[in-house]
Swiss-Prot record:
HAMAP family: Cys_tRNA_synth (MF_00041). This is Cysteine--tRNA ligase. Monomer. InterPro entries: Cys-tRNA-ligase, Cys-tRNA-synt_Ia_DALR, Cys-tRNA/MSH_ligase, Rossmann-like_a/b/a_fold, tRNA-synt_1_cat_dom, tRNAsynth_Ia_anticodon-bd.
Amino acid sequence: MGFVLYNTLSAELEEFVPINPPQVNIYTCGVTVYDDSHVGHGRSLIVFDVFRRYLEKLGYRVKFVRNFTDIDDKIINKANEENKDFMSIANRYIARYYLDMEAINVKPANVEPRVTEHMEEIISLISKLIELGKAYESDGDIYFSIDSFKDYGKLSKRSPEELEAGARIEPSLKKRNPLDFALWKASKSHEPGWESPWSYGRPGWHTECVAMIFKHLGETIDIHAGGIDLVFPHHENEIAQAESITGKPFARYWMHNGLVTVGGKKMSKSLGNFVTLKEIYTKYHPDVLRLLVLFTHYRSPLDFSFEKMEETKKAYERLKSAIEDIEPLKAIAKEGKPVVDIDFYSLEKSTQEQFYKALSEDFNTSLAIAHIFNAVAELNKAKTESFKIGYITPKELEGYLFLANSLKQTLKDIFGLLEENTLQNTLKTLEPASSVNISTEFLEILIKARNLAKENKDFKVADFIRDELLNYGIKLEDTKAGTIWKKP
């Protein structure tokens, strides 16, 4: 089944045609791990998790790469505030990230590369740009010259002059053009850094993603995804570097989700108007957040409020009641006149057709979920009438179950809803564990996070969790049957 997708690069709806079908390579920019993830991050994670599930349902073989930025000024500042090594800060928040993703049912990426493990590739990429005359050294720093790339601004649809006028750019005498951006920044001797041909330093943000994409996905990928706030300068600068080296399109499709706002202002840590994912999934079932995200078209802004969470919670309860709370209905099944005039089989067919049609038109989850809720309304109508009269006929019950099971399977497979897991159940009742008495439930969650890290070959995080637990006198042992723990 084909579908069309809005391509930020062309600003048009385009038919999706992978480079090497059925393979689809996707890269999405991950988090900078200096603090807990908030709802703004969660929206992007959920949108592209569902998009990936949709592609897989259509039969595509998806390689999904999402990175960790584990070296950044914000991480270094946090480390200085706490008098810790920057890597311990990064590892802490990567571990928490894994907990968040498991809680909100976001599937791990196939590859989750860390910037600090790709210094060789980053330095090699910068060297190539210098050789090509696209980058220059200035007092130990390396800058990309935007004047060397004639298509600069093609993603954001603005000229360099317009970009300069609208951008918040730090003035620097080191730059030839105010829009030139850092590929490598010299570090002070006491700061984190790596040796390079130019200086002891660390990479610029825009270079990191290009190097990781080249290594894990190749020179041209099918889809590059991320938040709309990354179009400029981040994604614009990625294109300039990648296409300067290869002379080929960096990505065939650019897919961007809209911002999460609070009262019309972007949710961000700098404004202090953010709500962490943990705050959400300890107060609500995580499916409520997924549903809130799916109710809005991925390209539109999503204005967050707890009032909307409450409304979504009620909608979710209607959904669960219709699809899962079926035993009381089975108990009153008996022969008699039909209770309702509903053709459950025709409704199932039309709902599925409308559902997939909506998703095929620029991944319109808002319309797709509306079709699901239309069918849910019919199920709840049948339940209400049956309980009022006191029975449902076996034939109607059979049709009801057929429709309910079909909807449930679709919601699980594509939207990642109604997939209860032990972590979600635990989080509903979990009390914060004290530093001297870690609860069994919380310990099991940490083991889950460690196992996820190991599955993704992120052994630094796995070792970090193990070592932190050792500080509390808890020893983890990996056995053939799984991970066991021992307390003194």
